[in-house]
């Protein structure tokens, strides 16, 4: 089964989360990574390749690759590229039963075009969703709004995964979000800083801490 990795906003941790899944289970489960729309060059795909050390065959080619770092609808307009959301939706629907990590661009309500939001693409594809959420001040409002948008569209939300640098509000943020939403808590991954992560640290420290109860692994088995 494919899983769509979405987030409450930009730079929340989707790419790190995707790296953790692929780095830990890519070889053993035969997982692939796919980012349908990439803005800002091919940075996320390259990040995953560098961190996981996996062969490029584990990384499917972007459907659309745009050099401007911005919302897909705006980046595509600047570069004269027409995003065919219907074709993209059909393609995602066709791979929904394959073992693929599908990473979205930006937050869930980011427009792909002037006519369709990312979340609508997820709904049309019928691929279940994991929501990556922040852990610091402001997380409650952001995350509950995102969950409400997902549930209003009757999308299969598998759970929430929290990523970020913790602060004094973190413990209560996670508790409050899970209590109010009723959505499954899949885990959390706390960072010490925003420093760029090396492959060595990722391989030794991060993979040993990730998904120790194998909750996420079971989605792909």
From Swiss-Prot:
Keywords: ATP-binding, Biotin biosynthesis, Cytoplasm, Ligase, Magnesium, Metal-binding, Nucleotide-binding. One of its GO terms (molecular function) is dethiobiotin synthase activity. Mg(2+) binds at residues 15, 44, 103. The keyword DNA repair does not apply. The active site is at 35. It catalyses: (7R,8S)-7,8-diammoniononanoate + CO2 + ATP = (4R,5S)-dethiobiotin + ADP + phosphate + 3 H(+). Its EC number is 6.3.3.3. GO terms for biological process: biotin biosynthetic process. It is an enzyme of class 6 (ligase). ATP binds at residues 11-16, 44, 103-106. It comes from the Bacteria. The keyword Cytoplasm applies. GO terms for cellular component: cytosol. Signal peptide: none annotated. Substrate binds at residue 39. Belongs to the dethiobiotin synthetase family. Homodimer. This is ATP-dependent dethiobiotin synthetase BioD. It comes from Leptospira borgpetersenii serovar Hardjo-bovis (strain JB197).
